[in-house]
């Protein structure tokens, strides 16, 4: 038996997800309550600055959902402590179906391994609503790096042990964990240069102060198009709509989970949010995500639309969790 089936936190999540799926069938009153919802404004808490990909996604969904539901949806950027403040605010909010968070893998999954203590337990204090979109990242290098694909890059970093630096948008970020794994498995002893955000990291990569980095497609594509950065590949097992000619690292022979796993943007709510309302929100999100203009805009920011059911989100989370946990261990990343 899979040991994870004995994890109390996971059992609680699965129970809530199954309860959500069954609620509309078992309780007619729940269906009536969900049909009346919402009767006032809804808040989407985004634990990141305005203007980033997650914020753009949240505002796009809020606009379309507001039209469908006939109520205002307020997007609140609650920034601070690597997304902890906004996520904690969601966990502590009334579980009445009027507060949700639109967040990333970092806050909903990774932070529990990066911090010895969090003010919230993501698997106890939140309920997953929908995996909104998958967010692969690009592996880019300075144009002077003599590599044009993944195999030649690995050969280059091996041949230059201890001489190369990679950047990330912060300790414990996807970019940090993936490059640390690459350095460790190739015995490359690359130096990690963490930045406070992706923009300064990309500027130093363009300037040649670091040699390689994983970066969002939203941030890297303009620099790739301008010839200021060279694209080596993208994470995941499918190519990105925004970079259709960019081969996946998996295609190029890097089949490790570290390169196949992708980040995601997801919606969660306070743990005791009524299952019928969780299901109703997921259903509405799926309808919005099917709109061609929404799918096109999401592709423009380097994401691919999913808009899953709560049950499917729990399954995806459970599949990804041991991969990310191992990447944190390999990197040695800690944030407290």
Predicted regions and their residues:
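N-terminal secretory signal peptides
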Residues: 1-25
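N-terminal signal peptide c-region/cleavage motif recognized by signal peptidases
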Residues: 27-30
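N-terminal (or domain-start) structured segment
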Residues: 32-123, 163, 171, 188-211, ...
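Short beta-strand/turn micro-motifs at beta-sheet edges
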Residues: 33-34, 125-129, 251-259
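An extracytoplasmic/periplasmic, membrane-proximal ligand-sensing/linker region
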Residues: 39-41, 188, 226, 275-336
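Hinge/capping helix and adjacent helix->loop/strand transition within the periplasmic-binding protein
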Residues: 92-98, 113-200, 249, 264-297
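A ligand-binding cleft/hinge motif common to bilobed small-molecule-binding domains
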Residues: 107-117, 180-185, 212-246
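C-terminal lobe and pocket-closing loops
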Residues: 220-289, 322
């Amino acid at each position: 038996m899979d040991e994870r089936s004995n994890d109390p936190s996971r059992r609680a999540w699965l129970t809530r997800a199954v309860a959500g799926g069954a609620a509309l069938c078992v309780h007619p009153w729940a269906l009536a309550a969900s049909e009346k919802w919402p009767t006032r404004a809804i808040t989407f808490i985004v634990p990141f600055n305005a203007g980033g990909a997650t914020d753009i996604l949240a505002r796009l969904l809020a606009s379309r959902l507001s039209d469908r539901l006939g109520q205002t949806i307020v997007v609140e950027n609650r920034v601070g402590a690597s997304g902890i403040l906004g996520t904690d605010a969601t966990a502590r909010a009334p579980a009445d179906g009027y507060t949700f968070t639109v967040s990333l893998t970092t806050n909903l999954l990774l932070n529990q391994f990066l911090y010895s203590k969090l003010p919230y337990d993501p698997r106890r204090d939140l309920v997953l609503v929908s995996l909104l979109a998958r967010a692969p990242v690009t592996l880019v290098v300075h144009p002077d790096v003599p590599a044009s694909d993944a195999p030649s890059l690995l050969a280059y970093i091996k041949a230059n042990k201890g001489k190369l630096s990679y950047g990330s948008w912060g300790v414990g970020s996807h970019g940090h964990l993936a490059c640390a794994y690459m350095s460790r498995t190739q015995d490359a002893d690359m130096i990690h240069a963490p930045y406070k955000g992706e923009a300064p990291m990309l500027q130093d990569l363009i300037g040649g102060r670091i040699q390689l980095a994983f970066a969002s497609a939203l941030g890297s594509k303009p620099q790739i198009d301008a010839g200021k950065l060279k694209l080596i590949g993208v994470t995941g097992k499918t190519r990105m709509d925004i970079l259709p000619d960019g081969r996946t690292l998996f295609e190029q022979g890097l089949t490790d989970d570290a390169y196949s796993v992708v980040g995601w943007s997801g919606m969660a709510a306070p743990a005791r949010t009524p299952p019928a309302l969780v299901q109703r929100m997921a259903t509405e999100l799926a309808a919005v995500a099917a709109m061609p203009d929404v799918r096109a805009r999401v592709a423009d920011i380097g994401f691919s639309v999913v808009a899953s059911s709560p049950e499917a989100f729990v399954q995806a989370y459970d599949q990804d969790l041991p991969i990310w946990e191992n990447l944190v261990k390999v990197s040695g990343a800690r944030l407290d």
